[in-house]
Structures are given as C-alpha cells and as structure tokens.
Amino acid sequence: MNPTSSNLLLLGIGGSGAAMVRGILRAYGPGVRALILDTDAKSGGSTGDIPFVLLGGNRLAGQGTGGQPTSARAAFQDNPALLDAELEGIRTVVVVTSLGGGTGGGATGELLKHLHSLGIVTLLFATMPFAFEGAERQRNAKTAAGPIEQHADVSVFLPLDDLVADAQTDIMGDALQRAVDTMATGVTLLWRILERPGYIRLDAERLRNILMGCGRAHFATATARGPNRASALLASLAEMPLLKRDESSPPVRSILIGVLAGDDLRLSEIAEISSGLSAAFGEKATIELGTVNDEATFSGRLSTVVLLFEESATSTRRGLDKDAGKPQSMGERSLAGNSRFRHTDKSTWNDEDLDIPTYIRRNLTLDR
C-alpha cells in the first residue's frame, strides 16, 4: 500500500506525540501516512523519514515552549494553514499527544479546531500526567481537555498511571517506555483493522461515520493464546483500569470491537467476545465490529481492540452536520440543542431559515 494514497492520517503533536508516532510506525511497519507537529525543531529528527511541521518558527525559533501552553497556543494561531498541504485528501485524523506540558497541552485544542473547520473527523488519544507529577501539571492537563473535547469528534484520555499499572518494572524510564508501547500497540492494532480489513470490514470510511460527533470514549486492547483464548481475553479486559467503570460513569452508547487473529479465528470466538463485552458494558449499546485475518502476524493468538463510546453532553455540543459532513452554522447549532423545536419543520422564506436570527443568517455585526 502506498501510504500517500490513504485518506487516514496519524498525527503526533508535541515531543510525546512525536515519540508515540515513531513507536506506532515501528510496530506497524510501512504503510501509515503520518505527520509530526511540534514547536521544538528536534522532534523532526535528523533523517526526515516522517513529514514534520514546525510550529511558531518565527515566535519560538524552534526551541520549544519551555512548558508554557499559552506559547504553544499562540504558535499554532500564528499560521493554522501551515499544515494544510499535508492534509490533502485526508478525511480522518488520529491525533496522539500528551497533556500537562507545553505544546501538547496548548496547541492540540487549536489543531482540532482547525481540522474540524476543514470537515476532517478526528479521533484523539491523549495521555494524562502521573499523579506524582503534581497538582499544577494535572490542572494544566484538565484545562487543555476542555477545548479538546469541544472540537474533537472522539476524545480518549489515558492516565499514565493506568497505562503502566501492569508493568513489571519500577524503573521510571522503563515504565514510561511501557506506557508509550502500550498506547502504540493499541493504535497499531486499530490501524491494522482499518487498513487490512478481514471478513467483517471496518475500514477508514466506516470508522469516520462511527466517530462523527461521538464525544468521550475509553480504549483498551488485550491478547490471549490457547484453547480458551476468547474467555481469557475477556477476563483480561475486565481487569483493565482503562475500562474501569462505576455507578457515576455515563452509560455506554456503543462499543467498537476489533478482532484480530490468524486463519484459525472461529465464529464462536467472535460471538463470545461480542456478547461478553455487551454484557459487561451495556446490553443496550450498539455493537460495531471488524475483523482482521492475518496469519503471518497473529498466528496462534487472538487480539482485540475495544472503544467504549459514552452517552454524554459532549456529543451534543459537537456542531457537525452528519449528513453533509460539514460544520453547522452558529444558528443551526443553537437550534439543534433546543428540544422544543427538534421535531418541527423549519420556517423558510426565499431559501432563508427564519428560525435563525437575522444577524446570524446574514453574517451581520451588531454594535455593542
């Protein structure tokens, strides 16, 4: 596959995002269309193997933000169109980053806002700081999450404490690498499902339709071997902190399940995984399923990728017209959330929607 032919893009923002992209490419191999954005010129690497866009070159001289999110936000706002040449033909972007620091925390919301303005659907994976990193870094991450959730179609926030919960080492460098590897493995499995679909297809265009305006999600992967591998896989998922839920958790609206195996994949295994996840996370939730049969990669093992999409207010705030795939106008967004008029016809005259205030309809600026 020619990576430049795909309408699916992997985009890492900030130093951590760049590291995640490189980890995913190592795990997947050739065939992933990727891009790195950062305020630090060193993230581009010396080989030029991955397209790189430097943010805020005139403002920051390629030296990074020094951990200041406001500097990263301003750097992106200087020239949002800087990356548009790399977005030609792109319909869906998977964004990976880390929150709590400078570039990831400050520029990711602006990036997602820009992608949304172009009609590009976005799935975001963002790591959240360790608890021991302190209140300020935690606060910065939560502050960054607000605009991210507003502009991303789907947001997956991954606490680093949960990513390393099953690590077999206490060495910090090894634990951090474990976190990157865990996230890279999950995104890599998702990429295989999209780009190498099996008998039950889940391709990039179907994913785009599933993701559009969904809001917050939870994400996990698991792998098992042996005669009872489907049961073992479900047991592993049940113990994962990334999928932990309690009485305060919003209901699960839908579950995306990717099943990856060799030629020995059985229908009974697919049924067991699907019914097991449905029973665990909500029998009323809709199921979206895709499979990959890849004997060379998955011989003897069974892997799964799970995305749980929650019922939340976030999805109703996303101003995306699902029929047209384009951003809605301000007036359309305001009316969409008004339940009084949800099931009534629009009032139109000369092709103008009279339910939308005149100053919005005609783009008039009001004196204050």
Predicted features by range, described:
Residues M1-R368:
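Tubulin/FtsZ superfamily GTPase core signature
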